Design a protein with these regions (language model features):
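Residues that cap or initiate secondary-structure elements
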Residues: 58, 82, 124, 242, ...
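Short low-polarity hydrophobic stretches
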Residues: 76-79, 236, 373
Length: 426
């Protein structure tokens, strides 16, 4: 039933047979290419779904059939990925293992076609003249344990990262990604995320090199927004820190920015950014990769002006490793490098807008069960209290039958021996 493992350490994700739900036709891994496969997906697209046969219980786990341009492919079906075999390519931890648990159905819901519908804190359509903007609390001021009816801009970036599976690393990952690769992956997911009556891709600006296809697409999105009056969203890496240009931060400078308006930021937004993302800004100044998501309103264009300018309405930052895995600290970065070096498969659970939830720094995906790993690098009373809560949580052997792993910097300066993957103990 399963396709052969192809990695150097035997921990690769597997391909399993796929059944087309409405016809019952089964395609083993060896037949999941070619004309018959593509024809079957095209006929099934929008009318049914696939079933992954990764478990020997005769109950296929649903998978989505999606279209990208002229191509069709099979992808995870939302809220069911945790029911797959741990080594299945469609497996992912459940919403309860990330910050997605912190939203109501008003904030995020699954459409009948498998797409997502979300409601943002700040709408893409500007309020009518005289109508007030909603007052948004900074990320650290959110009420604890309160499920939210809207998604913040940072939550949207976490959602896109998760849906594109950029927060997951497999031991057979073929190569490092570029900013343009990441932009393409985000665009693919934006096409299936609905905000009001439109999909996100219609207002999304992404990293682009001059004169390339992405540059032209960005320009078209900006031109369309000038006609419609919609607000835009840009995602991209912060440009390398320049102490002369960036110390006062009058503008948000993105890397690979072609087609993106010049982003001017006012004092109030700048103060909020520095308060909420001090660690990320510090890492940026140290040369680390930091991605930004920016919601903007285009400024009127003066006659004879060729440069588009926009006012930054909101901005959130995300710290990343060289492999674009999200990180919350420099110690997580050290651990992430070690996991990659050791040939492990893992995922980084995204917090979204649910900062008080208990979930680990990473989940190991090669243990055949939920296996949390943590790095503890602080010693404040508040941090120690949270660490105690996590220790109690992970002691539950029903949830975590193989236990958990941690690296406490105050106990061990070097990373302790990692647990062996399931394949080595078999």
């Amino acid at each position: 039933m399963a396709g052969p493992a192809t990695t150097k350490d035997g921990c690769a994700v597997h391909k399993y047979s796929i059944k087309i739900a409405n016809t019952g036709k089964i395609f083993p891994p060896s037949e999941q290419s070619g004309k018959a496969w593509i024809d079957a997906l095209e006929k099934a697209h929008r009318s049914t779904h696939g079933q992954c046969m990764c478990l020997d219980d005769d109950h296929g786990r649903p998978v989505s059939i999606r279209r990208l341009g002229e191509n069709f492919y099979v992808a995870r079906f939302r809220d069911t990925s945790h029911h797959h075999h741990k080594k299945c390519r469609f497996y992912a931890p459940s919403n309860e293992q990330s910050g997605m648990q912190g939203y109501t159905r008003q904030a995020v819901q699954i459409r009948e076609d498998g797409d997502l519908a979300i409601r943002l804190d700040r709408a893409l359509t500007p309020p009518r003249a005289g109508a007030p903007e909603p007052v948004l609390a900074p990320p650290q001021d959110r009420a604890a344990r309160q499920r939210r009816n809207t998604m913040s801009l940072g939550g949207l970036l976490d959602l896109l990262w998760t849906e594109a599976e950029l927060n997951t690393w497999h031991s057979d990952q073929p190569r490092k990604l570029s900013d343009q690769d990441v932009g393409g992956a985000l665009l693919q997911q934006a096409r299936r995320i609905h905000v009001g009556r439109r999909t996100l891709d219609g207002v999304l600006l992404l990293p682009a090199r001059k004169g390339e296809e992405e540059h032209d697409r960005n320009k078209e999105v900006v031109s369309s927004a000038r006609r419609s009056g919609l607000r835009l969203v840009a995602i991209g890496p912060l440009a390398y820190f320049d102490p002369v240009r960036d110390n006062d931060m009058p503008y948000v400078r993105l890397g690979a920015p072609f087609g993106v308006p010049k982003l001017q930021i006012d004092e109030a937004t700048r103060v909020a950014l520095r308060r909420s993302y001090a660690d990320e800004l510090g890492a940026w100044q140290d040369g680390k990769k930091i991605y930004a998501i920016v919601q903007m309103a285009l400024c009127p264009k003066s006659p004879g002006t060729f440069v588009d300018t926009a006012d930054v309405l909101a901005i959130s930052l995300l710290r990343l490793s060289e492999r674009f895995i999200p990180l919350d600290s420099s110690y997580e970065g050290i651990l992430e490098k070690q996991l990659v070096k050791a040939g492990r498969s893992f995922t980084k659970p995204m917090r979204f807008d649910h900062n008080d939830a208990v979930f680990p720094d990473f989940w190991l995906l090669d243990m055949e069960c939920d296996y949390p790993i943590e790095v503890f690098g602080m010693n404040t009373p508040e941090y120690q209290q949270r660490k105690a809560v996590k220790r109690t949580h992970y002691a539950n052997r029903q949830k975590y039958p193989k236990g958990w792993w941690y690296w406490d910097l105050f106990e061990h300066k070097e990373i302790p021996l990692l647990p062996s993957p399931a394949s080595e103990r078999a």
